[in-house]
Curated annotation (Swiss-Prot):
Designated name of the protein: Autophagy-related protein 17
GO molecular function terms attached to this record: molecular adaptor activity; protein kinase activator activity
Family: Belongs to the ATG17 family.
Membrane topology of this protein: Peripheral membrane protein
Any one GO BP annotation for this protein: piecemeal microautophagy of the nucleus
Source organism of this protein record: Candida albicans (strain SC5314 / ATCC MYA-2876) (Yeast)
Keyword field: Autophagy, Cytoplasm, Membrane
Main location: cytoplasm
InterPro entries linked: Atg17 (IPR007240), ATG17-like_dom (IPR045326)
Superkingdom, taxonomy of origin: Eukaryota
Function: Autophagy-specific protein that functions in response to autophagy-inducing signals as a scaffold to recruit other ATG proteins to organize pre-autophagosomal structure (PAS) formation. Modulates the timing and magnitude of the autophagy response, such as the size of the sequestering vesicles. Plays particularly a role in pexophagy and nucleophagy.
Localization (cell): Cytoplasm; Preautophagosomal structure membrane
This protein's GO CC annotations: Atg1/ULK1 kinase complex; phagophore assembly site; phagophore assembly site membrane
Length: 476
């Protein structure tokens, strides 16, 4: 009964119209579905392939950047430590050891210049002589000249290393630190994106509340709806074609044309729903593009900075570090050059310092012995003992003469043995061979205490007074 009503109320033209509308709508639906599928694939590729690949690449680059940054900083610090330990020590030794020792020697030489040597001390000399005139001044000047050359070379080397190594290392270190801090700040900007991607990778997209997860989840649901609508419209088109065939053959009663009519009437609404879904898919694609436009510049900028820094690092490690190393080695060899023999465990500063200290010690002893020992001994030998000898002689060659000669000879020998090395050879010091002796009852060595007529000279006048004044002045 129903089929008869349907067949009677639905004409062949209506069914043909439905089929044409179904075909047209299906064709448009297929095109929209194709475009929608392309849009979703593009969005999925951007969110699941492009961004992950970019992030993976920048993570690899940044890891390499961090390793190279740490490595070069360590090299710079190692170079600075080496300079401080092996090079700066040379300059510190000059300041702490060599310069003070040189100053002490100059002070003692100045004291030698102030210490007068009377004519009685050295025969055939004029007044105005000082102890300084009896030093190895040429050797001392040569030593000081060599020390001056050494210090001048060290100063030039220090300026060279400060300018060409230390300053440039500090500049490079500051530049590296500045670029590193800038890169870290930029890298931190993509940290949320990295976390979002990790959450997306380790969890299903339909469970992620992140932007990318939401987009992918929405597109998956929309894709399912598109498939459902496409299947429904395809089925409706098939039913329409079947209805046309049945009605044309007079078998229209075999179909429920009422349902087909309702489907045909709902077709515009279904297509509208399809276009709405497609609009959402396009909006998701646009959102994805904006998302990329927000993050990709940072990723690209970080990538460019890191690549640029890695290139700078490579050049620094292959060109600058070897150049610094070679320059330091050359300077270190120059700093070891010395005009005197140097042991393996000594530096030129230590050798020069030791020599200066030995000279200073020698001349300190020289002055002290001259003032406290030599002048008194000279007075004894030229005035005190001759008077004693003459006194004994006047006692008609008392047997004590022989004894005091022996005593005096031994005393002079001991004195010469103890202090003689500090007395210049030009200085007058009779010694054992000028002991007063009796030669045919003619006295010798008493000229300082006797007048030409053989009478005793008045004490504390002439040479003796000068000598006594110097002894007295030395003891003050």
């Amino acid at each position: 009964m129903t089929n008869e009503i349907n067949s009677a109320t639905v004409t062949q033209d209506e069914v043909i119209k439905w089929s044409r509308e179904a075909q047209s709508t299906l064709e448009k639906t297929q095109k929209i579905c194709t475009d929608a599928q392309s849009s979703m694939q593009k969005t999925a590729q951007e969110l699941t392939i492009l961004i992950p690949d970019k992030l993976q690449a920048i993570e690899f680059l940044f890891k390499s950047y961090r390793e190279q940054y740490d490595s070069i900083l360590k090299q710079i610090e190692t170079t600075k430590i080496y300079l401080h330990t092996n090079i700066d020590k040379v300059f510190n030794d000059i300041k702490d050891l060599l310069d003070p020792s040189l100053a002490r020697l100059n002070n003692i030489l100045l004291e030698l210049k102030k210490t007068r040597v009377p004519s009685i001390v050295v025969e055939g000399t004029s007044e105005g002589k000082t102890l300084f005139d009896f030093t190895s001044i040429q050797s001392i000047n040569l030593l000081k000249e060599n020390i001056g050359i050494f210090k001048s070379n060290c100063s030039k080397i220090k300026n060279l290393l400060d300018l060409e190594v230390k300053e440039k290392l500090n500049i490079e270190q500051d530049r590296m630190n500045s670029r590193w801090n800038k890169s870290v700040k930029m890298y931190d900007l993509i940290a949320p994106l990295q976390l979002e991607l990790r959450a997306l990778i380790h969890g299903a997209s339909n469970e992620s509340n992140s932007f990318m997860g939401t987009i992918l989840r929405e597109n998956q649901a929309l894709e399912n709806e598109l498939v459902s609508i496409l299947e429904m419209q395809t089925n409706h088109f098939d039913q329409c074609m079947k209805a046309v065939e049945l009605i044309s053959s007079g078998n229209g009663c075999d179909m429920n044309l009422g349902v087909l009519k309702n489907d045909a009437q709902e077709l515009p609404e279904v297509f509208k729903e399809l276009t709405t879904i497609y609009d959402i898919i396009l909006r998701n694609e646009e959102r994805s593009k904006k998302f990329l436009a927000t993050h990709m510049p940072n990723i690209e900028k970080i990538s460019d900075i890191v690549k640029e820094e890695l290139a700078v690092f490579r050049k620094f490690k292959t060109e600058e570090i070897p150049r610094y190393t070679f320059l330091i080695a050359e300077c270190e060899n120059k700093l070891k050059e010395c005009s005197m023999p140097v042991k393996s465990d000594q530096s030129p500063s230590q050798v020069y310092t030791q020599t200066l200290q030995e000279l200073t010690e020698h001349y300190v002893k020289f002055i002290n012995i001259y003032k406290t020992k030599y002048l008194a001994e000279l007075h004894h030998q030229q005035f005190t003992y001759p008077r004693k000898f003459l006194k004994k002689l006047t006692e008609f060659l008392n047997e004590d003469i022989y004894r005091i000669q022996i005593e005096e000879s031994e005393r002079r020998r001991q004195w010469t043995s103890r202090y003689g090395e500090f007395i210049p050879s030009e200085f007058k010091l009779p010694g054992e061979h000028e002991l007063p002796v009796i030669v045919q009852i003619i006295t010798e060595g008493l000229e300082y205490i006797q007048k030409e007529d053989g009478q005793e000279e008045e004490p504390n006048i002439g040479n003796e007074k000068e000598l006594m004044d110097m002894i007295t002045g030395s003891n003050k």
